[in-house]
Amino acid sequence: MSATMKQVVLAAYAKGNPKPADFRIEEVPVPQLGEREILLKTLWLAVDPLIRFSLDEKLLSGATRMERGAVMVGPTVCEVAASNHPDYASGDIVEGRSGWQEYAVLAPDQSDYRGPPRKVDASLAPVSTALGALGGPGQTAYEGIVNVGKVKAGETVVISAAAGAVGSMAGQIVKVLGGRAVGIAGGAAKCAALLDLGFDAVADYKAPDFAEQLKTALPEGAEVYLDNVGGDVTLAVLPHLKRGARMPMCGFIAYYGVGMEGPGPDHLPGFYRQIMAKALKIEGFAGIFAGKKGLEDIAGWMKEGKIRFAESVVDGLDAAPQAFSSVFSGHDHVGKLLVRVAPEA
């Protein structure tokens, strides 16, 4: 093992969508292992859009700001390279939040609310799925469709950002439950990928006839709208929701880079009118509430061939800043966007 390693640090707070220049790659010594600590070698890292909340100089309420020069945070899958902790052995594969770096030392006994690094069962699926289908995105999709959306057989569910990690899983879960899945994505390639995953219909929000595509895809409206984006896409969907429709809200990526006020005119009065007129049931949620049952159900569906995991992979830690920036700029990736930092043994 080399005596030094690479890590990606925050060079500047983001203004609008993050740019590669907001980050800096540094070479530092590999950290030394202390008592009851584990040394992790990063295999995979996820460039999650939620990280964006921590990159503003002026924060949204509830977010924790990163300091300039700090190692970028984010979920990872790692191999235990060395261990001074009885619960972990060299060679174990774990999922945690060790950040954008080639190696990290963690003290499992001093973990935050997420708990210590979770061991990954490589017999269930490729270990990278611990960051996607069998990780946070899978839990979020499950929570939104099963527990919050309460989707029933025969219902139509429309999903924004459907080609993303959460959306692509959510549509497949809808199909497992006997529902009709309608996906909204940007570009013909993404829409074709959704149909290949089993979605019943798609609408391309980048197309000039998006409104007509949406009308065609939802001839009788929808009982559930899983909203991942907010913004103009959600404004276009609202007229198609049936009275009493459920609207699980798990993201608003259209606004992640604009601060508290948001851009342009205030659409809230019109939004309120739609809520009142249609008696919409809106609920924000977090995927962590899906818990163990959600992951067990998803693993079972994957084993039965009812759900496929979609991943897009870029190689090398150096690629992480560009990969993260692409999440906010209409990238062509489908499913979970991952950075392969090192090959698996």
Indicate where each model-derived feature is located:
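Glycine-rich beta-strand-centered segment in the early N-terminal region that forms part
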Residues: 29-47, 56-100
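Short, glycine/polar-rich helix-capping loops at beta-to-alpha or helix-loop-helix junctions
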Residues: 102, 186-195, 267-272
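C-terminal hydrophobic helical "lid"/dimerization subdomain
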Residues: 2-3, 289-345
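Mid-domain Rossmann-like dinucleotide-binding core that forms the NAD(H)/NADP(H) cofactor-binding site
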Residues: 131-208
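Short glycine-centered segments of the SAM/dcSAM-binding site in methyltransferase folds
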Residues: 93, 156, 180, 245-246, ...
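NAD(P)H dinucleotide-binding glycine-rich loop of Rossmann-like/cofactor-binding domains
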Residues: 72-79, 86-161
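Short amphipathic alpha-helix with an adjacent loop that forms part of the alpha/beta core around
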Residues: 209-220
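Glycine-rich phosphate-binding loop and adjacent beta-alpha segment
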Residues: 232-307, 341-345
